[in-house]
């Protein structure tokens, strides 16, 4: 089965506790993207030139409801380029690529 890449629009974030935020992304797809508990998506973030700097895997934190909205719960990693982007640089409406679900 081939991997499908989606555009994911950043729609918001909320501080859960100090250093951990919830993030919401809306997958742009003509049909619902189904996933199961325990699965994850790989995000290609604009945080470097090499794939190892850009690709991050995040477990899905919400139950599938057909809305194509992914909720992620992410802990800030000091010095982490992906953390810098997600916690400080991303803006509502920004679009990143992601693939999945996997796992």
Placement of each model-derived feature along the sequence:
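Ferredoxin-reductase
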Residues: 2-94
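A short, basic/flexible loop-to-alpha-helix module at the beginning of a structural domain
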Residues: 87, 100-103
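Structural and coupling elements of P-loop NTPases
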Residues: 96-98
């Amino acid at each position: 089965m081939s991997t499908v890449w989606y555009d994911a629009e950043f729609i918001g974030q909320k501080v859960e506790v100090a250093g951990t935020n919830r993030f919401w992304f809306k997958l742009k797809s003509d049909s619902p993207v189904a996933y199961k508990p325990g699965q994850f998506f790989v995000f290609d973030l604009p945080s470097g030139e090499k794939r190892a700097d850009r690709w991050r895997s995040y477990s899905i934190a919400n139950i599938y409801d057909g809305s194509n909205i992914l909720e992620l719960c992410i802990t800030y990693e000091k010095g982490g380029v992906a953390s810098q982007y997600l916690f400080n640089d991303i803006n509502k409406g920004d679009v990143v690529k992601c693939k999945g679900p996997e796992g």
